[in-house]
Amino acid sequence: MANAIIEKANQRFEQSFQSLSREYASIRAGRANASLLDRIQVEYYGVPTPLNQLASITVPEARVLLISPFDKSSIKDIERAINASDLGITPANDGSVIRLVIPALTEETRKELAKEVKKVGENQKIAIRNIRRDAMDEAKKQEKNKEITEDELKALEKDIQKATDQAIKHIDGMTSEKEKELLTV
């Protein structure tokens, strides 16, 4: 029973790490990366559709993304969705493909993005602490129902805290790595 609580918490921690990775991948660092476009939804025949399902996205050069729509008639919709997004990149449409030239980041933009990275990391740490709280509540409930002893509860709480500390340390590492990537010119 006790191991099941820690196992469940660890699975939720892992989901948080994956979520944070996806979030960080979508924050542009001055280099072209197809995951920048992951959050873009295109209005395609009245249905919001992820861009990566409507087109192939390639990186021909370090700061260029090339979007090749599978259906050429959707090119205007894709262009409209990119313009409406918060990317701050203007698409260049040549009729069959869309080019996105990623501008070099200014020092000010880098610092703003670093703040955003910190904020996202903090939100993820809050999620980790909520997972810890849920695990602790579950352990206390088991102790109250006499499924585990008070000593087992203390040991379990200690293990949960240790796992939480490791998860927060991992998030701190991911955050500082992304900040370093952003602030490197």
Swiss-Prot record:
Organism encoding this protein: Streptococcus uberis (strain ATCC BAA-854 / 0140J)
Localization terms from the record: Cytoplasm
HAMAP family given in the database record: RRF (MF_00040)
Protein name according to UniProt: Ribosome-recycling factor
GO MF assignments: ribosomal large subunit binding
Gene Ontology biological-process annotations: translational termination
Stored InterPro entries: Ribosome_recyc_fac, Ribosome_recyc_fac_dom, RRF_sf
Residues of the signal peptide: none
